[in-house]
């Protein structure tokens, strides 16, 4: 181990075992103790991303973990981000900037280059912070991905760090997951696993204890603790769409989101899931768009392909019918581009080069260009002059007469997005609209909700991060955790 900041890595036996949540919890727990801690994920594959203070993009899970550390997000926290744009390919983002798109086979060969970026970022963080809290990806026991691994044990071996292995007991088979994962590791990898965390346990811990005793005897490794199942924890999902909603009573505004094949940044809708006056529905393939007050076209990593999918499902006609009956329609980022008259991709940035007809609901045309726009912004919504904060992640340049009726006026003087002449259709490039309390309330009133209850989404997220840290204090072996971090136990 180096005398620089200590590194501790959390790996999982499966996807969705609880790695992101545990790293978030450990980050806030250490930050509350006054430890200078920073999150790190060598490689992330996700379509939910955040814009960083240094003008790049990283996975949204790392942005939440940065908040847990009380830090601004930085590209070094997630040096390699893969954003799938086909079933076999992805855009490769290194240190926050898109470098190329490649298929899985080509990326496998590229991993040696990616590892250089990973180690450079880790080195900078380890030099600046006392603890680097690392999140792995998927499982370390994927045999077909072991060669050139940069996301799990390949990274842990390269920087010589200890590993905690987390498993989800709620899905069943937790002992097989843990023991099986260890069996598939090399001797040196197995040695660096210093303990287990069992996640999402329901019931009487005394009934689990015989299994824990067996696990420790079988593996020679300690169980660092058992975290309870928490049903009302609402932090942003790393990739899968979270459809859970807060308990709601009384009249509600109906909001519908069509789920397109390459939907991106669906965390935009988390504030609506949690809003007590909103009934949010995600509608997938094979489903008709139900009646609604507001339809929101989400962001997309492949806008022309998603627009074709929308038409194949008959949703374009359903949207027009929705507008004829007085409904409201909002497009966010790729959704804004779909609302226009034409969409051009001359460079083939999101698939085959070419042009597509848009929905024709706003007098706009968009051309995709190589330089991606990445920025955090503040401004005011055209509705009620409501203040807002958000972020832009897009390659499109949009032009047209509808821009004379902007959806947002930014503090830097730029206008963003557009509104239709009748005011029923609106589009914006800004993600995170609903996270700003005043802007969210204004949009809900625009969509037909008369008496809107203001909800502070940022406060809710901060509350849940604090709850996670409390769970660490109550349920994990904090003495052993501090020792793994090189911190005194006081």
UniProtKB/Swiss-Prot annotation:
The active site is at residues 333, 431. InterPro entries: Class_I_gatase-like, CobQ/CobB/MinD/ParA_Nub-bd_dom, CobQ_GATase1, CobQ_N, CobQ_synth, GATase_3, P-loop_NTPase. Residues 252-439 form the GATase cobBQ-type domain. It holds the Pfam family GATase_3. Keywords: Cobalamin biosynthesis, Glutamine amidotransferase. Pathway: Cofactor biosynthesis; adenosylcobalamin biosynthesis. GO terms for biological process: cobalamin biosynthetic process. One of its GO terms (molecular function) is catalytic activity. SUPFAM superfamilies: Class I glutamine amidotransferase-like (SSF52317), P-loop containing nucleoside triphosphate hydrolases (SSF52540). Catalyzes amidations at positions B, D, E, and G on adenosylcobyrinic A,C-diamide. NH(2) groups are provided by glutamine, and one molecule of ATP is hydrogenolyzed for each amidation. Belongs to the CobB/CobQ family. CobQ subfamily. This is Cobyric acid synthase. It comes from Pseudomonas aeruginosa (strain UCBPP-PA14).
């Amino acid at each position: 181990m180096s005398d620089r900041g200590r590194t501790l890595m959390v790996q999982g036996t499966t996807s969705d075992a609880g790695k992101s949540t545990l790293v978030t919890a450990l980050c806030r727990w250490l930050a509350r103790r006054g430890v200078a801690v920073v999150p790190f994920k060598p490689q992330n594959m996700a379509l939910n991303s955040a814009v960083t203070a240094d003008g790049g993009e990283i996975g949204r899970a790392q942005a939440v973990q940065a908040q847990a550390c009380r830090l601004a997000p930085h590209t070094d926290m997630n040096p390699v981000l893969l954003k799938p744009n086909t079933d076999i390919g992805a855009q490769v983002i290194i240190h926050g900037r898109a470098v190329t798109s490649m298929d899985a086979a080509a990326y496998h060969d590229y991993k040696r280059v990616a590892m250089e970026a990973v180690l450079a970022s880790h080195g900078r963080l380890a030099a600046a912070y006392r603890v680097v809290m690392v999140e792995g990806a998927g499982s370390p026991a994927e045999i077909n991905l072991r060669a050139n691994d940069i996301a799990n044990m390949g990274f842990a071996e390269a920087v010589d760090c200890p590993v905690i292995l987390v498993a989800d007991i709620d899905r069943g088979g937790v002992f097989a997951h843990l023991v099986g994962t260890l069996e598939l590791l090399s001797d040196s990898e197995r040695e660096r696993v210093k303990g287990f965390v069992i996640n999402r346990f329901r019931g009487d811990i005394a009934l689990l204890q015989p299994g824990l005793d067996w696990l420790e005897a079988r593996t020679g490794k300690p169980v660092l603790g058992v975290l309870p199942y928490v049903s009302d924890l609402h932090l942003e999902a790393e990739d899968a769409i979270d459809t859970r909603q807060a308990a709601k009573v009384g009249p509600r505004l109906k909001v519908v989101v069509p789920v397109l094949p390459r939907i991106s940044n669906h965390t935009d809708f988390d504030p609506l899931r949690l809003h007590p006056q909103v009934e949010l529905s995600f509608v997938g393939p094979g489903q008709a768009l139900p009646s609604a007050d507001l339809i929101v076209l989400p962001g997309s990593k492949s806008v022309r392909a998603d627009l074709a999918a929308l038409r194949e499902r008959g949703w374009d006609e359903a949207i027009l019918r929705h507008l004829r009956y007085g409904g409201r329609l909002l497009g966010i980022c790729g959704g804004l581009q779909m609302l226009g008259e034409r969409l051009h991709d001359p460079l083939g940035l999101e698939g085959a080069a070419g042009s597509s007809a848009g929905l024709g609901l706003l007098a706009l045309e968009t051309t995709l260009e190589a330089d991606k726009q990445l920025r955090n912004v503040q401004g005011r919504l055209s509705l009620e002059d409501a203040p807002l904060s958000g972020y832009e992640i897009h390659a499109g340049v949009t032009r047209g007469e509808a821009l004379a009726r902007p959806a947002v006026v930014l503090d830097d003087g730029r206008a963003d997005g557009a509104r239709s002449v009748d005011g029923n259709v609106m589009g914006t490039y800004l993600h995170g609209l609903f996270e700003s309390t005043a802007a969210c309330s204004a949009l809900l009133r625009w969509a037909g909700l008369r008496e809107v209850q203001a909800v502070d989404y940022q406060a809710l997220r901060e509350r849940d991060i604090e709850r996670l840290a409390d769970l660490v204090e109550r349920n994990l072996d904090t003495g052993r955790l501090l020792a793994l971090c090189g911190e005194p136990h006081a």
